[in-house]
Structure formats: C-alpha cells, structure tokens
C-alpha cells in the first residue's frame, strides 16, 4: 500500500513538472509572438520615417539644385558681361595703339626721307672734301719741295732739327715745372710738419726735475752723526756694505750726504737711514732689517711708478715685468733728464702727432713709452740700450710694430713705419727742447766755442755764430769767395767735421748764408 502511495505521489509530481514546462513553453511562444509583432510595428514605423526623410531630402535637393542653377546662370551672365566689357576695352586700346603706330610710321617715313636727303648731301660733301684733301696734299707736297729747295735740307733732316729744338724746350719747361713742384712740396711738407709738431708740443706739457748723484738726509742734531758712524765705524760700514753707496759725514751741520751713481741703491739707503734716525736704534742688526724694509718699499714705489706712467699715457695690457722696468726708469737720468718723464713725454708727443697724421696712435704711444726701456737694465746687461729694449719688448710679447719702433728710434735700423718715424721725432723733440737736458756750464761754453772755431777754419767764412743753445750754427760767407753752388758742399764739410770733433746730444743744424748787396744812387 505504501508502495502504491509513493508511486501515486511520483506520478503527480511528474504531471506537475510537465504542466509547468508546457506553461513555460506557451509563455515563451506568447512572448516571442508579442516581440515579433512589436518589431514588425517598429520596422514599419522606421520605413515610414525613412520614406518621409527621403522625400524631404529629395525636395531639399531639388530646391538646392534649382538655386544652384539660378546662381550659375547669374554668374555666367555676369562673367559674360565682364568679358564683353573687357573685350570692348581691349578693342578700344588696340584701336588707339593702331592709331599711334600709324602716326609713328608716318613720322618714320618722313625721317627716312630726310635721312636719304642728308645721305645724298653727305656724299656730295665727302666728294668735295676728298677733292680738297687731294688739293691740300698736292699743295703740301709742292710746299715741302719748295722748302727743301730753299733750305737745302731733306724732310727727314728738317724733322730731326725741329724735334730736337722742341725736345730741348720741353725739357727746360719740365725742369722748371719739376723744381717749382718740388719747392712747393717741400714748403708744404715743412709747413705741415711744423704745424703738427707745434700742435703736439702745445698739447703736451711735462715738468722735469734735474737729478743729481747725491741725496741729503737731514739729522735732528749733530749727535746723531756719531751714532750713525757707530763704535769703530761699524754702523757706517754696515750701511755702505748693504746698500753699495758712500755715506759722507762731514762738517755740514745736521746733514749726511749719500753718494752713489745707482739711484735705486741711493734711494734705498736714504729711506733706510731716515727710518733708522726716526727709530733711534742704530746697530748692525737693526740696519740690516731697515735696509730690507727699504728695498721692499722701493720695489713697491717702482711698480707704482710704472703703473702710473702707463695709466697717464693710456697704454694698457703691459706685461708686469715691463711695468717694473718702467718704474725703474724713474731712478734713471740722461743728461740730467729723468728717463721716465722723458718716456712719458715721448709717448704723448708721438701719440698726438699720430692723431694729426692719421697713423696708429696706440702703437705710437706704446712704442714711445717703451723706447728707452733698455736703460732700466743696460748697466746690468751688455749691449746698447736700443737692442736691449727691443729684446725685452719682444720677450714680453709686444707687437712687431712696437719692437721695430724701439729698434729704429736711434737709427740703429732704418725706420719702416710711420709710427717708428714719429717715435724718433718725438724722442728728438723731448731731448732737444730747451731746459730738458743740462750740461756743465764749462762744457757748454767750450762746445759753443768749438763749433765757431770749426766753422771759421774753412776758407771763405766771414763770421760764424753758435745759436739755439748750441743746436744750430749760422755761418756767413764771403760772396766773392764762395759761389751759390759751393754752399751745399761747404755746409756738408762743416757738418762732417763737427761730427768728427764735437760730442753733443741730439743734432746740430748747420746754416750757411751767402749775401750779395748792390748799392747805387740815383742823381
């Protein structure tokens, strides 16, 4: 029984499942059919919408097509009008050009006719000229034959005589013209040179203090002399040994004289002695200490002097060793003229003259400042100061133009640049101007007397005067004894004898004057 009940239950379950499956299937079919109906409805709606859009688009396209056709027709009409107008304008222009061409053709035809007439006239004139030339040639030939018959000379001989006469006349005229041009050129060159030198000297003012070979140190009292001498002279010996100078202690009240030909050593001794006097402690150890301090102080003074000189002239970029050598020139003199001051003056003069002539003023100033740099070491190195200075400039990378100007400033080599010539001239101006250099009075008087004696020793000399502080000698000659042509020879002979017998700085101008005076009286 239980088995039957279980079987009945299982049958009922299967029925229920089948019923559920059938219901699901029916629901699925119903949903499918409903969706199909809805989809078909949407498709129909979309088709209707598409047809509506298509019809609307067709209408719009037809409208735009009609508008485009209208616009195209209007554009074609406008272009046709413009083209027709342009054609009309071109046609009018062509008609005007054609008219002008016709007018030009008429003018050309008239000119051609005129040219034909002129050609005919020219041919006639040429024939007439040819006939005249033939007549002239015939007459010329007859004249030459007649001249040859009268003069007894052939045509070639007459030509030769005429050419020789003309050549002599032309040579004479050329000689006169060349001499006039040379005189004018010399006068202009002298005038311009004097003007340039005058301007340079006016714009350059330098003061010079004559240097001596001694320095004087003032003492607070005469007792200090004994302390300077020291026990058994040990202090004075120490000072002289360390500085290389002579210390002169004499009866001069409250003063000690330092003597020496090396200005740097003399300056070191002066500074050291002044410091010792101020300190009051004078003994060999203290003297050695003060001399070392004085040496450092003088070294600083030398560098400062070199820098100030370069700055004053406007020269930059000098090697430090050249700066030191420039500073050493402050303690050097030449004929009583301070060499550093002289170098500054030469640099200024050379630069000013270079500006006036349009030359390189920077090279002229640089070479002028360094031209005597060899004098800073020439007592320590063998050789002339010119060659030493050029070697130093080359060693410390100065330009070839500067080195050449240094080498040429005393004519050791021929100056090849205008800057070298200007440095040479500036050096001569600075050295030769009155007051720049001094000599002993006795030597000065002897030199002037010697100059006049040399001039008077020549035959034909009437008077001789040494002027311009011995830098010029003016000689008056007897006109009956010396001719004008002999003046140049006499001046040269006197110059050569002066060069051989007289020592002098710079140069001496020899002027020989011959004067003839004729006197008569009107009655």
Curated annotation (Swiss-Prot):
Predominant subcellular localization, coarse grouping: membrane
Membrane topology (UniProt): Single-pass membrane protein
KH domain boundaries: 213-276
Pfam family, one: RNase_Y_N
InterPro entries: HD/PDEase_dom, HD_domain, HDIG_dom, KH_dom, KH_dom_type_1, KH_dom_type_1_sf, Ribonuclease_Y, RNase_Y_N
Keywords of this entry: Cell membrane, Endonuclease, Hydrolase, Membrane, Nuclease, RNA-binding, Transmembrane, Transmembrane helix
One of the protein's GO biological processes: mRNA catabolic process
Domain HD: 339-432
Transmembrane portions of the chain: 14-34
Entry keyword annotation includes Lipid biosynthesis: no
PROSITE patterns, per the entry: HD (PS51831), KH_TYPE_1 (PS50084)
Source domain of life: Bacteria
GO cellular component: plasma membrane
Gene Ontology molecular functions: RNA binding; RNA endonuclease activity
EC nos: 3.1.-.-
Subcellular location: Cell membrane
UniProt enzyme class: hydrolase
Function according to Swiss-Prot or TrEMBL: Endoribonuclease that initiates mRNA decay.
NCBIfam families: HDIG, RNase_Y
HAMAP family: RNase_Y (MF_00335)
Family to which the UniProt record says this protein belongs: Belongs to the RNase Y family.
Protein name: Ribonuclease Y
Organism of this sequence: Caldanaerobacter subterraneus subsp. tengcongensis (strain DSM 15242 / JCM 11007 / NBRC 100824 / MB4) (Thermoanaerobacter tengcongensis)
Encoding gene (name): rny
